[in-house]
Amino acid sequence: VIRRYEHAAPGDLIHVDIKKLGNIPDGGGHQVLGRAAGRKNRSGVGYAYLHNAVDDHSRLAYTEILADETKETAPAFWTRAHKFFTDAGITVHRVLTDNGACYRSHPWRDVLAEAGITHKRTRPYRPQTNGKVERYNRTMLEEWAYARPYTSEQERRAAFPAWLYTYNHHRGHTALNGSPPASRVPNLMGW
């Protein structure tokens, strides 16, 4: 049984997750070149790790495209994400993550403790517990990463800031009665 919930105020709970995404080789992948040619063009391009933080109440999202998912990278990402939410007028109380190694590390624990934030983890093998960020991952893949055939990873990354701005400020959400996340955030001055 899946129980749906929504916290009462922005910052009551922030869902955090990492999405691993294959890089696009220069010249394009299979969407540009076709399946057979795309296979020949893919070797050694590696992965991008999309570190995501989504507010439970407003669905306001913060994402960075980083090179890895280590115990050093995740806390550094959270420091910047926390500043993003604070600048938007959101006081973060709790963070929900899966049980990835970077979220079980001492640096992650310490960065949350320094800010007075409670850390909650999902039960193992229950990604639906962190469903709001998992749904955000799916939306991000459908509407940005795989929305059109990019000819390089640089082209795809260059398109990301505009997509994220649209997601936060203009894209309506069914769960928010068709309103964008920005409509539920008390202070978006300077954006």
Task: State what each model feature region is.
Residues 1-6, 11-12, 113-117, 138-191:
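C-terminal domain-tail junction helix/linker
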Residues 1-32, 101, 109-111, 126-129, ...:
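Basic, flexible linker segments flanking DNA-binding modules
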Residues 16-61, 73:
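An active-site-proximal beta-strand-loop segment
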Residues 17, 53, 59, 77-78, ...:
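Mobile genetic element proteins and their domesticated derivatives, centered on retroelements
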Residues 39-41, 46-49, 64-89:
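Active-site beta-loop-alpha junctions of metal-dependent nucleic acid enzymes
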Residues 60-64, 120-122, 146:
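Short small-residue beta-strand/loop micro-motif enriched in glycine and branched aliphatics
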Residues 91-99, 113-132, 148-151:
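RNase H-like polynucleotidyl transferase catalytic core
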